[in-house]
């Protein structure tokens, strides 16, 4: 049990380190938006435009970082499979014994694979939340534009009738 706790804590710490590194800009921007919403209540049009542009840009670079994690995950899978197969080939005994030896030989690679896999999933979750925020900001902007257009059409329409 203690071994599981230690290993899982190690996986969590290292994957969190990757996530912090790759998502720092996105996390910082999401915190700024949250603080503005909590403190000011309403974001100005200029701030809204800036956040839409900044968030789209940040998501682009975070997506690139996520793909780098995916590449590392794929590479780790290949290395693990290669070691597993080599150990299986070189082992003597029954199929069950060969499988057990191969699994034992690839424990470290499996842990590294889990680290990259968890980090990839965590970055993806943050990116998904970032896209949700971006879509929400766009909806707010579109609503404001519609309200302005409606107001202008009433004003212009009112002038024609006078």
Predicted regions and their residues:
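Extended, charged low-complexity scaffolding/tethering segments
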Residues: 1-43
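Long, highly charged low-complexity segments enriched in Glu/Asp and Lys/Arg with interspersed Ser/Thr
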Residues: 22, 28-29, 129-150, 158-162
């Amino acid at each position: 049990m203690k071994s599981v706790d230690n290993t899982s804590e190690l996986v969590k710490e290292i994957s969190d380190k990757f996530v912090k590194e790759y998502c720092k800009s996105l996390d910082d921007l999401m915190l700024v938006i949250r603080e503005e919403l909590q403190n000011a209540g309403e974001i100005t049009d200029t701030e809204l435009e800036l956040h839409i542009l900044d968030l789209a840009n940040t998501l682009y670079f975070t997506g690139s970082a996520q793909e780098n994690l995916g590449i590392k995950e794929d590479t780790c899978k290949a290395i693990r499979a290669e070691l597993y197969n080599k150990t299986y080939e070189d082992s003597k005994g029954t199929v069950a014994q060969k499988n057990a030896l191969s699994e034992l030989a690839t424990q470290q690679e499996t842990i590294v694979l889990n680290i990259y896999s968890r980090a990839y999933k965590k970055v993806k979750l943050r990116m998904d939340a970032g896209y949700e925020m971006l879509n929400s900001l766009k909806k707010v902007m579109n609503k404001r534009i519609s309200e302005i257009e409606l107001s202008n059409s009433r004003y212009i329409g009112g002038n024609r009738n006078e």
